[in-house]
Amino acid sequence: MNIYDELGIPKLINAVGTYTVVGGTRMSEETLRDLCDAARSFAEVEKLQDILNRKTAELTNNEAALLCNSCSCAIYLATAACVARHYGKNFNNLTAEEISRCEVVALWGQHIPYDHAMEQLGVKIRFVGFPNMQAEMSHSVVKDAINSNTVMCYFAPRTPDGYYGEGCMNLSDFISIAHSCNIPVLADGAAQLPPKHNLWRFTRDMGADMACFSGGKDLCGPQASGLLLGKLELLKIATELSFPRYGCGRIMKIGREEMVALYSAIRQYVNADEEARLQWCENEVKKLVSNLAECKHFSAERTWPNQAGQPLPRAFVTLKSETTTPAQLRDILRNGNPGIICYSENRPGVYINPMCLADGEMEQIIARLKEIDQQLQ
């Protein structure tokens, strides 16, 4: 009996992807071993942090890195670093009034719940443009929003087929506009892995001053971990404000276990075979599509990319029953044995995303869908 059995918590097959609400991802056995090794012995946290940050920067081709407890934490600390840079003094010596005068420029079409991390610091977000408008945005819209109180420009990179419309402007132009006004840019790439080259593409190749990523998504680190990468000047400030030091980042504690495990996961990730992983996902999708071909109430097709714009395939299973809704199908799958969690995204069926599946789980999904097919009227 494992801990979930003891607690009476049903284990699920994750067919949605790296969503926090279902636990994000799985750590590898190597990562789990490194996490346990870190837990068994004490270490000076600041010394451990310095070494892990330096090695992570080397692995990701960045000037500097900071391992923290979430991507939201990375956004918060990046913003604090930019506020400190703006005033040219220690953030911890600033007044609430001084912080409240600071502004971050962002795009309306990228307004997401996670940008509250910046507002929690006390700064204001100045949104420009229109939400999800499928039209080209003028560069002057962004440039005119930058003023003497602007400390940072925030951008959430996505592919055109991902969350946001093309009207949001591209990252290269956004960086160019911000830098023409001497304002640093944070690229929020929380779920923008794969491809792994995004770990250095946004910063080293495209010029963003900082980029942040979730550690608990495709990096396959601990769920409570995040990564901030970028310019040494800003990362040095962010590190000085982070745990275990006193100040605004003290509340965002990350244990030695999570730091070591995240570093281990990153090391494995940058050395992994992306093509082999892509081919595995393609094979899983083909397996589902071919096995549902004879079903009466289901048909399946390959879709691309996935919901976060990541370059990985999914399958969409169309529900052809007139007596069962997609919501009911999701409930049947979630409450079955095995429990399978999947989303519909306002379409007449369910998506099956292979990115978090283990070997053999697609076969269980296929068997369950065939069983449901026999039961539907």
Q: What are the language-model segments listed below?
A:
Residues 42, 160-161, 358-359:
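Short strand->helix junction
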Residues 268-274, 350, 355:
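Glycine-rich phosphate/diphosphate-binding loops and the adjacent beta-loop-alpha structural elements
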Residues 13-51:
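A glycine-/small-polar-enriched, mobile loop at the entrance of the PLP active site in fold-type I
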Residues 55, 59, 270-304:
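Conserved PLP-dependent catalytic core of the aminotransferase class-I/II
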